[in-house]
């Protein structure tokens, strides 16, 4: 993600700032960091986390020395992949729901979009994210908290607007957004490895109903169907 405006500084930009070559070639350093993350994502799609550093630098087209100028090792790169994946997802959700006029309709859409992978039976991606999330959280708790912040911030914007409009009554919008993020993460992680669950088909609506009630929403709001990860039409907003 770009660092322009109010957007957070990306991992690639932070990695470039840490590089000893930053003053001479910051743009090149950012490009290399970005290429390593993109290469890691391609390798993860092929074989999960079971790729070597040598495979990574070959896929990224960078020297091994360049790799170690940006990260201390593979775990830091996987952390960067996790951060970028979450940030990209949050940006995609926001863009896809932009035409929904009601903040609760957008929030509802985000719940459906966040749980879409496990709901659609895509096991490889969710299982990688789940297993690596908790492993990396033990190694880098502060960094992983930072990685999930784009989703919490996305929820907070909609909760705050909904509260301003009198649609919900959360006692603490920031805490509500954080707890909502954690609930969706826990649900996502559960269904990534669950074999059979008769409630899987309704999990999105179950989570949304619970969150809306916790926020102080109304029965009318509960009737809005959860969004999918596609560009919604303006007619679906309220």
Model region roles, listed by residue range:
Residues 115-157, 164-168:
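Short secondary-structure transition hinges
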Residues 1-31, 219-238:
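N-terminal intrinsically disordered/low-complexity leader segments
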């Amino acid at each position: 993600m770009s660092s322009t405006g109010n957007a957070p500084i990306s991992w690639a930009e932070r990695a470039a700032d840490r590089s000893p070559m930053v003053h001479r070639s910051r743009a090149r350093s950012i490009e290399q960091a970005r290429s390593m993350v993109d290469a890691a994502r391609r390798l993860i799609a092929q074989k999960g986390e079971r790729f070597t550093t040598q495979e990574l630098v070959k896929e990224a087209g960078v020297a091994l020395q360049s790799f170690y100028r940006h990260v201390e090792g593979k775990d830091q790169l996987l952390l960067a992949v996790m951060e970028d994946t979450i940030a990209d997802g949050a940006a995609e959700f926001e863009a896809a729901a932009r035409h929904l006029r009601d903040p609760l309709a957008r929030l509802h859409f985000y719940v459906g979009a966040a749980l879409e992978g496990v709901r659609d039976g895509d096991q490889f991606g969710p299982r990688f994210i789940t297993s690596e999330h908790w492993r990396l959280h033990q190694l880098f708790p502060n960094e992983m908290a930072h990685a999930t912040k784009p989703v919490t911030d996305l929820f907070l914007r909609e909760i705050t607007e909904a509260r301003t409009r009198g649609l919900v009554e959360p006692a603490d919008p920031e805490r509500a957004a954080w707890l909502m993020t954690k609930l969706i993460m826990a649900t996502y992680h559960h269904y990534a490895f669950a074999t059979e669950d008769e409630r899987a088909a309704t999990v999105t609506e179950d989570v949304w109903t619970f969150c809306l009630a916790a926020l102080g929403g109304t029965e009318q709001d509960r009737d809005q169907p959860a969004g999918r990860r596609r560009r919604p039409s303006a007619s679906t907003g309220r």
